[in-house]
């Protein structure tokens, strides 16, 4: 069975710098409000996502907030963003517009509107443009994005949402998407694949409805396209050889599928339909590995700690690390080349070093299963080194035990989360973290993997010195109701999913057919309130086919993912299409 979903923002993504040059320069209006939505740490040490809105009047601002909530929660439902959202700060910039909507929407002859970012469809209201190419004034966007203080431009992704239900967007460091379209929230993770991960499109066409032709070039630089056979990849240890034969996270099996990079023949990709080909599916493992590397490269796994240099043997060496949502980073210490067991702090006094000079090294890397290439894993690992001179005496230190950066406490965490804390760094003592789950003591260092919890609300506390932090744990999974209906002829099926949760925030619904990849339920491409339609031939919308389902018996699984990241238990419905 094959479900065809829209794969592109436009037939081809045009670099934003090329399509904004013809737009008039604008002076940014000063009335804008920066709202931090997720702050996981110092913006200078995080990857920062800045979300702007255009064409939203003061009266429209509640809709903008809802649009942003949906976009973010869809993003957090997709790996690796789900596991590494703790590496990302998110800021919403509310820019009241004098008028509602954006220019040339939906037609190229429709009204041109004076909005703060000058967003417009049709490649900037060009009669020879592409309707879905949603552009904006990059200078204005930069001015508003700069209202978020302390965020380095080099470590920032700007996403601008247009007040529109028309499908569209564009890629680049200044990405765009329509805020209210049924599928618009799926544009963001696809575009981040380009701008953050350097991934290529896997479309087998350049213009919708026009076959892409045959690729006749050499072996592409793209890590997820090749001319090699599976046997050649294995024998030569090239491209995605480590993943061959695995069940793809995007459905099917990692292998070799013809078409990609706008060509329909002569070039091959790893999966039948990853998010870089069809919006709605996940990244496959090949692209997910690259995105994990790219997100990790935007930050430093060692955030802080004892400065490198010469120290005495009477002190404590410390490192602060990042804390992924679902696992702990690996911290490995060596003294004179020999491994020693320690956590984030190494108390040199306990080593009883012989008089003289010694070398201490620490390495922090990520043991995630998302990475299989050792070179990729090593590319964002970090190390620190110290010279230990036993003749050096550490001066008195007035630093008190206390908290540093922690997992944010302002929103619930999911039941299977890892909660992370960092502490201050007294020179001659290692602060102890005392953990409790619902009042019961548990043993952990700087990362607490939550134990199995019954459905409901729970509380975790951590105490360091006289300071305490408390987290709320949402252990109640979301639910989803399904309505599957067929006419008497049984030749089609409509599926409507309605997710819900006991906590605030947009709840994502997904389904998969006959064990294929999980697919985001967005309603119907033209209307988020309509159910998804399956037929034997599918429905063609703007030269893309949706809901093609062969005649026969099928099992449809469905589930929900809540704002905290909990998965609901998958349920099934069995249908027969005649």
What are these regions (language model features)?
Residues 192-208:
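Catalytic Zn2+-binding segment of zinc metalloproteases
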Residues 63-64, 168-189:
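Short pre-active-site segment immediately N-terminal to the catalytic Zn-binding motif
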Residues 101-104, 142-178:
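Catalytic zinc-binding patch centered on the HExxH motif and its immediate surroundings
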Residues 28-145, 179, 368-370:
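Propeptide-to-catalytic entry region of secreted or membrane-anchored zinc metalloproteases
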Residues 327-384, 410-412, 422-578:
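Long, low-complexity serine/threonine/glycine- and acidic-rich segments characteristic of extracellular
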Residues 1-28:
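Secretory targeting and sorting signals
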């Amino acid at each position: 069975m094959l479900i065809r979903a829209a794969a592109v923002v436009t037939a081809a993504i045009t670099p934003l710098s090329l399509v904004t040059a013809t737009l008039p320069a604008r002076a940014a209006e000063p009335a804008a409000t920066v709202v931090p939505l997720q702050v996981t740490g110092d913006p200078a040490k995080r990857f920062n996502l800045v979300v702007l809105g255009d064409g939203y009047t003061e009266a429209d601002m509640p809709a903008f907030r809802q649009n942003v909530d949906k976009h973010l929660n869809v993003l957090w439902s997709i790996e690796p963003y789900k596991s590494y959202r703790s590496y990302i700060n998110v800021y919403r910039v509310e820019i009241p517009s004098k008028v509602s909507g954006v220019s040339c929407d939906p037609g190229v002859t429709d009204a041109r509107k004076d909005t703060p970012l000058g967003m417009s469809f049709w490649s900037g209201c060009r009669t020879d443009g592409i309707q879905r190419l949603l552009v904006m004034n990059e200078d204005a966007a930069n001015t508003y994005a700069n209202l978020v203080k302390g965020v380095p431009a080099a470590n920032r992704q700007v996403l601008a949402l247009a007040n529109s239900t028309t499908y569209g967007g564009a890629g680049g460091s200044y990405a765009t998407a329509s805020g209210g379209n049924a599928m618009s929230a799926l544009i963001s993770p696809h575009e981040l694949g380009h701008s953050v991960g350097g991934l290529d499109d896997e479309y087998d066409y350049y213009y919708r409805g026009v076959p892409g032709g045959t690729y006749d070039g050499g072996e592409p630089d793209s890590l997820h396209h090749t001319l090699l056979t599976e046997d050649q990849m294995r024998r030569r240890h090239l491209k995605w050889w480590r993943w061959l034969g695995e069940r793809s996270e995007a459905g099917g099996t990692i292998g070799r599928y013809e078409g990609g990079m706008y060509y329909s023949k002569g070039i091959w990709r790893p999966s039948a339909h990853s998010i870089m080909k069809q919006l709605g599916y996940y990244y496959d493992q090949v692209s997910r590995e690259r995105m994990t590397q790219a997100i990790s490269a935007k930050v430093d796994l060692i955030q802080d700690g004892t400065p490198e240099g010469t120290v005495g043997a009477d002190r404590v060496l410390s490192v602060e690390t990042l804390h992924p949502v679902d696992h702990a980073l690996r911290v490995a210490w060596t003294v004179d080349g020999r491994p020693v067991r320690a956590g984030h702090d190494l108390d040199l006094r306990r080593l009883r070093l012989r008089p003289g000079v010694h070398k201490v090294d620490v390495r922090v890397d990520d043991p995630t299963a998302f990475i299989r290439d050792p070179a990729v894993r090593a590319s964002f690992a970090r190390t620190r080194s110290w010279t230990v001179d036993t003749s050096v005496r550490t001066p008195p230190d007035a630093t008190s035990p206390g908290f540093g950066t922690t997992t944010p406490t302002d929103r619930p965490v999911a039941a299977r989360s890892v909660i992370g804390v960092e502490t201050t760094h007294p020179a001659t003592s290692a602060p102890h973290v005392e953990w409790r789950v619902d009042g019961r003591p548990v043993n952990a260092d700087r990362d607490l993997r939550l134990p199995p919890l019954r459905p409901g609300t729970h509380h975790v506390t951590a105490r360091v010195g006289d300071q305490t932090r408390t987290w709320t744990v949402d252990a109640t999974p979301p639910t989803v109701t399904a309505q599957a209906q067929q006419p008497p002829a049984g030749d089609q099926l409509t599926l409507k999913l309605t997710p819900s949760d006991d906590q605030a925030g947009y709840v994502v619904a997904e389904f998969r057919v006959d064990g294929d990849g999980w697919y985001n339920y967005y309603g119907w491409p033209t209307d988020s309130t309509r159910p998804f339609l399956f037929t034997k031939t599918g429905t063609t919308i703007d030269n893309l086919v949706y809901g093609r389902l062969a005649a026969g018996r099928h099992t449809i699984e469905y589930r929900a993912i809540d704002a905290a990241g909990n998965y609901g238990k998958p349920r099934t419905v069995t249908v027969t299409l005649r």
